[in-house]
From Swiss-Prot:
One Pfam family hit: Fe-S_biosyn
Any single GO BP term: [4Fe-4S] cluster assembly
Protein name: Iron-sulfur assembly protein 2
Protein's cellular compartments: Mitochondrion matrix
UniProt-listed InterPro entries: FeS_biogenesis (IPR000361), FeS_cluster_insertion_CS (IPR017870), HesB-like_dom_sf (IPR035903)
Cellular component GO terms, alphabetical: mitochondrial intermembrane space; mitochondrial matrix; mitochondrion
Protein source organism: Saccharomyces cerevisiae (strain ATCC 204508 / S288c) (Baker's yeast)
Function: Involved in the assembly of mitochondrial and cytoplasmic iron-sulfur proteins. Probably involved in the binding of an intermediate of Fe/S cluster assembly.
Length: 185
């Protein structure tokens, strides 16, 4: 009896809209289309320099990701390392880890001219994106960059937490975890 009385006092109204009125794409937050819109609206930074740049391969970094990386670097002197490995529910997964900045920063940062030809043939060399004003670095090995070519590193704030994400490029599909993906051939 009290529940019925409470229900009538609150005067619940039925919503005037139904889910059928909205296209399904409104609810696919992890879809490629959603992230494409996100990236086109978000400004990208130009790295101060790219060490060991490989022609034809690129990783874009959003302004939001750069700001967060600068904050991390300022507080703990750590850089972001991106790597890709096989696994996950879609075939590949990327790992984002923070590693301490060292002096000299990275083994591949300064090359000895005498051995530069030998180092250029190394498939595991690191490509280093130096953020503007030397406020951190993004480090990715050449094999991972080959898979993540033309993608964008961004930083998202969501209700469930904040995280770095890699979006666009040849990423065909991803899962709910946000780190597993499949690539287009």
């Amino acid at each position: 009896m009290q529940a019925k009385l409470l229900f009538t006092r609150l005067n619940f109204r039925r919503p005037s809209t139904t889910l059928r009125q909205f296209p399904l794409t409104c609810f696919l937050f992890h879809s490629k289309a959603f992230y494409s819109d996100l990236v086109t609206k978000e400004p990208l930074i130009t790295p101060k320099r790219i060490i060991n740049k490989t022609p034809g391969l690129n990783l874009s970094i959003s302004e939001r990701a750069s700001n967060r990386l600068a904050e991390i670097y300022r507080n703990s002197k750590e850089n972001l390392r991106i790597s890709v490995e096989s696994g996950g529910c879609h075939g590949f997964q990327y790992n984002l880890t923070l590693e301490p900045a060292t002096k000299p920063d990275i083994k591949n940062d300064v090359k000895d001219k005498e051995f530069s030809d030998d180092l250029d043939d190394d498939d595991s060399k690191d490509i280093i994106y130096v953020l503007p004003e030397d406020k951190g670095r993004v480090i990715i090995d050449s094999k991972s960059l080959n898979i993540l070519n033309n993608t964008t590193l961004t930083y998202t704030n969501e209700l469930i937490g904040s995280s770095f994400k890699i979006i666009n490029g040849s990423l065909k599909s991803s899962c709910g975890c946000g780190s597993s993906f499949d690539i287009e051939n």
